[in-house]
Structure formats: C-alpha cells, structure tokens
Amino acid sequence: MATSTMILGGTGLLGFHTAQALLEAGGEVTSVSTESNNPASWYPSQARLHKGDVFTMSSERLEELFAGHDSVVYALGPDDRVTPPAPASAFFQERLVETSVRAVAAAKASGVKRVVVFGSYFTYFDRTEPERGLAARHPYMAARVEQQERCLALASDDFSVAVLEIPYVFGLVPERNPLWADVLVPRLDLMRPWIFFPPGGTAMTSAGYVGRVARSVIEQEITGPLPVAEQNMEWKQFLTIASEELYGAARRVITVPGQLVAGYGVGQQLALRIKGLDSGLRYRDYLANVQAKKSFIPESVIDELGSRLGLQPGSVEPAIRKTFAECRAISERPRRKSEPS
C-alpha cells in the first residue's frame, strides 16, 4: 500500500526509522520537526522536510499541515527523562496529553484516515497489572494513560488510531549522540570496577522494529493499544553487553536490593525539589517497584503482534551493541546534540 504520511518529530530516533520503513515500502513521507542541525544533509533524500513546532501550533494550523496526507505518525515526547519546573503533572498534561489529542483531532478533521501515536509501555502494565497503581503514583505514567485513552476515543469507522506502547529502545540516528550517552553512560563511568544495579529487567526493542511496526499498523488501519517489544532482558545481561562495548571488556554486575536503591531515589527527589524542579516519576517508588522488577511483556504477546503484522521480532543485542559502541566513540570526537525525545 502506497501511503502519504506526515511524521511529527520525524528527525528523532523513532521518527527517523519510521520514515525509513515507510520509504522502503514506496510511501511518501513529510517530516515535521524543530530540527536546526541541517537535516537535509543526513535525512533520507526522498522525504520532504518541514520546520515547525507542533507544541505551539493551533488546531487550524495543524489541519492545514495535514491536508493531503492519508496518515500521521505522532513521534513526539517528552519522555520520563525530562524534569520540568514543579509540578510535573501540569507539564506532562500539556506536552504529552493536550498536544497529542489536539494533533489527532486535527488529523481527523483534515481528512487523514490513519494515525499512529508513539506511547509508552507503562500504559501496558497499568492496564494489565492495575494492582501496581502505576498511574496513581507517577505523573508521567498518568499522563501516558490519559494520552492513550483520549487519542483512542477519537477513532471511528473511517479513522483508525493506534497507540504503540514502546519499551526501552536502541538504535542510532545520523548526526546525533544516542540518548544513552547522557542517561546511563555517566552512571556506569562512576562505578568501577563493578557495576551496582537493582534486580529486574525490561522489555526492549530496536528503533528499526518500531518503524516497521508503525508502517504495518498504517497499512492495516489498526485501532487500539499495541505493546511493541522484541525481547525481554534482565538488567544483568543488558549491562554486561553494554559494558563490553563501552569498555572493551564486560564488567561484573553486582545486584543491589531494590529497597536499598530506593534510598538513592529519595536523594534525587530532594535535589530536584531544592531547585524547584519535579520529575514525572516518583523515584523512590520507581526504583523499588518498577526498575527493580521484571517489566516484561509476555513472549506470547510479542509473537502475537509480530504474526498479526507480518513481522518477525528479532534479537535486540545487535542494536544494543551498536548503540553503546557509538557511545564509546563519541568521546573521541567533538560533542554533538543528544537524541531528543
């Protein structure tokens, strides 16, 4: 199926790989972003580039922008790394919920037939394990749940809306530092000779797989929440692979009880409060009850989505290795902009 798709946030990690997947299938792509780093020099030449800030656009401007396209991919953040001025709930309400709902509604009004929203796998766990109370505890997760509910509510018989529930992602974008260079590498650099980390693990995927999933969802006009993952991996295995690429040899990973790690979260939260900042995650609870647990998506669910979309989930290890090999390489050249949400 040849499609004409507008990707909001098309120069980010997931937007870039989605553009590649759509172009490989013969589709037309227009990318919208605030990118100022001359994306024409590295973005796929077949795609059209449009500079604009979706967060400040009116519904009318969005409708004008979407006109003539049959599909829209909403690949904008922010994600849970952002620590805005307190209260975090107000920030995520505006930047995650209201902006995405405004964009999806504008897409429907402009005649677009298919929308894919990139969400978070926290909504999957909030839905399947309600006893954990994730949305009730964490403003970021609450915003993701509301984003999903309100975007899906706009779907109709002739307008499909899918929300991809995306876990940890690995991959590269030209002219960008991997987000992991800022998020994880500095922490690992401080832990020598061993790495101390809580138990548990996470579902994960490659950016390329997310792009292919988005393409297939558009082609099949699917509506609903879709948990996207390729495999589950415990932190110990993940950190062994990452440290091997970062330091040339795997470091020993020592497991620290989750409740002990939670004490570190109290200090993090206090440091933010002193600065007048807030996190969308309540660090103490997050470290003890999320990061220290196995946030795994069942293999049956992973395989079911792959079969439904005609895709084959693969090993994420090659993407992890490429990502952290790049993290190691960036120390040898001038610093570039890190991958945005």
Identify the residue ranges that each predicted region occupies.
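NAD(P)H-binding glycine-rich loop region in Rossmannoid oxidoreductase-like domains
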Residues: 47-98
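N-terminal Rossmann NAD(P)H-binding glycine-rich loop of SDR-like oxidoreductase domains
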Residues: 5-25
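Terminal hydrophobic/aromatic helix or amphipathic segment near a protein terminus
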Residues: 240-295
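Conserved Rossmann-fold NAD(P)-dependent oxidoreductase catalytic core, especially the SDR/UDP-sugar
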Residues: 98-143, 162
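Substrate-binding strand-loop-helix patch
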Residues: 199-208, 226-245, 258-265, 314
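Oxidoreductase cofactor-interface core, primarily capturing Rossmann-like NAD(P)-dependent enzymes
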Residues: 131-224, 229-231
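SDR active-site strand-loop-helix element
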Residues: 8, 32, 75, 115-121, ...
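Amphipathic terminal alpha-helices
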Residues: 295-341
